[in-house]
Amino acid sequence: MLEQMGIAAKAASYKLALLSSGEKNRVLEKIADELEAQMESILSANVQDVEQARANGLSEAMLDRLALTPARLKAIADDVRQVCNLADPVGQVIDGGLLDSGLRLERRRVPLGVVGVIYEARPNVTVDVASLCLKTGNAVILRGGKETHRTNAATVRVIQKALKACGLPEAAVQAIDNPDRSLVNEMLRMDKYIDMLIPRGGAGLHKLCREQSTIPVITGGIGVCHIFVDSSADIAPALKIIVNAKTQRPSTCNTVETLLVHQDIAERFLPALSKQMAESGVTLHGDETVMQALHGPAKLVPLKPEELDNEFLSLDLNVVVVENMDGAIAHIREHGTQHSDAILTCDMHNAARFVNEVDSAAVYVNASTRFTDGGQFGLGAEVAVSTQKLHARGPMGLEALTTYKWIGFGDGTIRA
């Protein structure tokens, strides 16, 4: 089954690569319209998925990732329209020039071909990935988690209906709707057909893909994100940033999980933090210093060492007091996932040092980690957030779904 999907996707990719920007945008507009027109069928499938997931004991954080609402689905359709408004990178000449040999050389952006995406309980990924792949002339094979297989199947049917209406092969966007996990292992070996693989899920999925895939893999999305409250931080705006980074949508990978507090500000800062977190319903996981300093009003539990590597994805926050900037940077290097980390400070020298020494895909000064997002970065819907360094890093927008080819123009030109 998968080989036939691969053959069809590869054939579709050749047709997609020839489309003009206008033709691709018309497809995306049709998809957005169909998502809204067929909203009832998608939401009905999603309700079944959510009910099944709840019966299976999924956490509230996972249920939040899984659930669609009319507002969320409308926002997904609007994200597709936003992709229409983005500049098409395909065909862009990156650089080039006339060589001494007389050969005119240019490096031009082209589609990757076929992209494979394996993801878990995130139904929005189906549309986000499909829209970005189509905009860049790529076909895509999707494998969502068993928790979302009804939602994904309904969504892909809508997308394929739009493709067919625009005269394009339905195989341009395909989904593996069989929840059998053995198919993941088979997909990881489809290097004959899939040009790049993107896993979006937990650490176990990323480890499996890195170790078993014969396809180039882009890993990331696991966010043990940190905020360091420097000794010079302005407490009031710092608290607003922390509340945003922790509570706006706790189930996302750009949510802060560990707060590092400089010891020189801890006595003034921790009581204010506890009050604010109590109002926000956040449970603090405090180190020994924090446990001694606080006695409410926020719920406070002792920090377990293994929790420093946790992606809680819930209203839980580690709080650790560090001696200085060196301690904060060392902690991030040991426990961070190179996703998103921030410093809150009024000392621009310390800010510059933090930016230079923290090796993450996104580093912020006096801002929330929640900004690490394709839409917030102006990239449109993102296909993933990469925490590796080769090919793509950070939110992966359109350019990350392209490669390039060298093109030489001659006039009977030969090598001497």
From Swiss-Prot:
Major localisation: cytoplasm
Annotated gene: proA
Protein EC: 1.2.1.41
InterPro entries: Ald_DH/histidinol_DH, Ald_DH_C, Ald_DH_N, Aldehyde_DH_dom, G-glutamylP_reductase_CS, Glu-5-SA_DH, GPR_dom
GO cellular component: cytoplasm
Protein localization: Cytoplasm
Record's catalysed reaction(s): L-glutamate 5-semialdehyde + phosphate + NADP(+) = L-glutamyl 5-phosphate + NADPH + H(+)
Taxonomic source organism: Salmonella heidelberg (strain SL476)
Described function: Catalyzes the NADPH-dependent reduction of L-glutamate 5-phosphate into L-glutamate 5-semialdehyde and phosphate. The product spontaneously undergoes cyclization to form 1-pyrroline-5-carboxylate.
Top-level taxon in the UniProt lineage: Bacteria
GO biological process terms on file: L-proline biosynthetic process
Alphabetic keyword roster: Amino-acid biosynthesis, Cytoplasm, NADP, Oxidoreductase, Proline biosynthesis
GO MF, one annotated term: NADP binding
Pathway(s) of this molecule: Amino-acid biosynthesis; L-proline biosynthesis; L-glutamate 5-semialdehyde from L-glutamate: step 2/2
Protein name according to UniProt: Gamma-glutamyl phosphate reductase
Family: Belongs to the gamma-glutamyl phosphate reductase family.
